[in-house]
């Protein structure tokens, strides 16, 4: 039994559901890999907010609250998407699709985590961070999952806003306010989400089509999709450069180099489709994770070292 990309993988013969299997099912509902990526952006945001002098206990408390919020939102997303997860090969091994965890129990689990995240952040950080976390969960579940996901090909554009909120929560936990660097970090992730998700959707187009989810690759041509990927990749890189106004030389250098690499990959995908070649969009999906991680790790190091900045925030 193991977890992979939020899926419950059962390597043993079918049989009664044991305690360990059930426990792994609950863990899978929270989508640990997704949480990992979200939390990678929180620490750099907090370090930038106070140029590396943040209380370690505040960082830990914010991460715990963010983990609870993301786990709760992901679990509730799985509850709402249980019907379509059964129809997609990529998600057919998730706990609810396989009935490893009762749907009602998953709902209670998700709600409990969500409520716990609010009160944890309220008691250990501040009210603004708690409200931002609560609003993020509500937006992700009610607006993205229930309203947008099955109705529009632009679902991930607007729904992706939920994935941008960890930087806002991290910043507000330190400062008690929202300032323009936090908004720029929000935009970085907002613009990064469509090319990241659409590249995956290109690879699993048949899955989404079978489930009736109108992802852009399902309703548009590959050339149209890769053109949109290219546009959002450029916007992502430009946003990372805008953030360089409030960072040191280390972040700025990494943002330029990593951004160039990300743009080259997006242009190669677009050019390959335009020439009618067989392309591998999953490569862009995987490398986009690395890109975001590299940029935010550079931001964390730059901020921790308190390198001289172009502008003082």
Curated annotation (Swiss-Prot):
A GO MF term = protoheme IX farnesyltransferase activity
Please report any disulfide bonds recorded for this protein chain, giving both cysteine positions: none
**UniProt catalytic activity:** heme b + (2E,6E)-farnesyl diphosphate + H2O = Fe(II)-heme o + diphosphate
The protein's Enzyme Commission number: 2.5.1.141
Q: Which domain of life is it from?
A: Bacteria
Pathway entry: Porphyrin-containing compound metabolism; heme O biosynthesis; heme O from protoheme: step 1/1
Q: Which HAMAP family match?
A: CyoE_CtaB
InterPro entries the record matches: Protohaem_IX_farnesylTrfase, UbiA_prenyltransferase, UbiA_sf
Stated role: Converts heme B (protoheme IX) to heme O by substitution of the vinyl group on carbon 2 of heme B porphyrin ring with a hydroxyethyl farnesyl side group.
Return the protein name: Protoheme IX farnesyltransferase
A Gene Ontology biological process term: heme O biosynthetic process
Q: What family is reported?
A: Belongs to the UbiA prenyltransferase family. Protoheme IX farnesyltransferase subfamily.
Claim: Transmembrane helix is one of the keywords in the record:
yes
Reproduce the miscellaneous comment text: Carbon 2 of the heme B porphyrin ring is defined according to the Fischer nomenclature.
Localization, per the record, is: Cell membrane
Q: State the membrane topology.
A: Multi-pass membrane protein
Name a single GO cellular component.
plasma membrane
- CDD domains recorded: PT_UbiA_Cox10
| Residue ranges of the TM segments | 34-54, 56-76, 105-125, 128-148, 152-172, 173-193, 237-257, 291-311
Q: Identify the keywords attached in UniProt to this record, alphabetized.
A: Cell membrane, Heme biosynthesis, Membrane, Transferase, Transmembrane, Transmembrane helix
Q: Name one Pfam family in it.
A: UbiA
